[in-house]
């Protein structure tokens, strides 16, 4: 290892946004590395094999939401699957792809995955295994990606439907 950089990942930063940010950080780091190698000011350091991690290949199945998980876990999955393959869940007879969501500070005693409400300025409120989540932007079956409030202006969103159910 020649040089390294560290960066925080924002709470709702998507994989695509992080990729773009890391490209800039990586470019700057590459220039510093080349400069340091030319000046002889960089000493290679062996990587600690005990600290390495394995990242499996991402498939469409990776993005399928398990609503029994906590709202923060589901939110992180949604961010991590944006822009491909997008987090998704069964919705009525189709697939709902979720582009963005926000964790809600409320709990629910309803079934995990149940659509609880459509709240103005917040989104579609969903019960999770622990906590609740607002779906903000989504792609409903046979539709394009859009804010869920905009979608609801022209389509009925039935409360009480449980997402992820066959």
Where are these regions (language model features)?
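Active-site-proximal loop/hinge segments within enzyme catalytic domains
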Residues: 1-104, 121
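An anion-binding loop in the catalytic cleft
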Residues: 68-166
């Amino acid at each position: 290892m020649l040089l390294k950089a560290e960066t925080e990942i924002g709470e709702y930063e998507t994989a695509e946004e992080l990729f773009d940010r890391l490209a800039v950080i990586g470019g700057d780091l590459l220039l510093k590395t080349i400069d340091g190698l030319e000046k002889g000011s960089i000493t290679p350091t062996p990587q600690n094999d005990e600290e390495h991690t394995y990242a499996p290949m991402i498939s469409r199945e990776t993005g399928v939401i398990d609503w029994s998980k906590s709202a923060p876990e589901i939110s992180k999955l949604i961010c991590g699957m944006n822009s491909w393959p997008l987090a998704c869940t069964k919705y009525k007879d189709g697939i709902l792809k979720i582009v963005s969501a926000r964790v809600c500070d409320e709990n629910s005693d309803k079934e995990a995955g149940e659509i609880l409400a459509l709240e103005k300025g917040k989104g579609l409120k969903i019960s999770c295994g622990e906590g609740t989540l607002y779906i903000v932007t989504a792609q409903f079956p046979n539709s394009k990606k859009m804010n869920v409030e905009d979608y609801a202006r022209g389509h009925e969103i039935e409360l009480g439907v449980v997402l992820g159910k066959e």
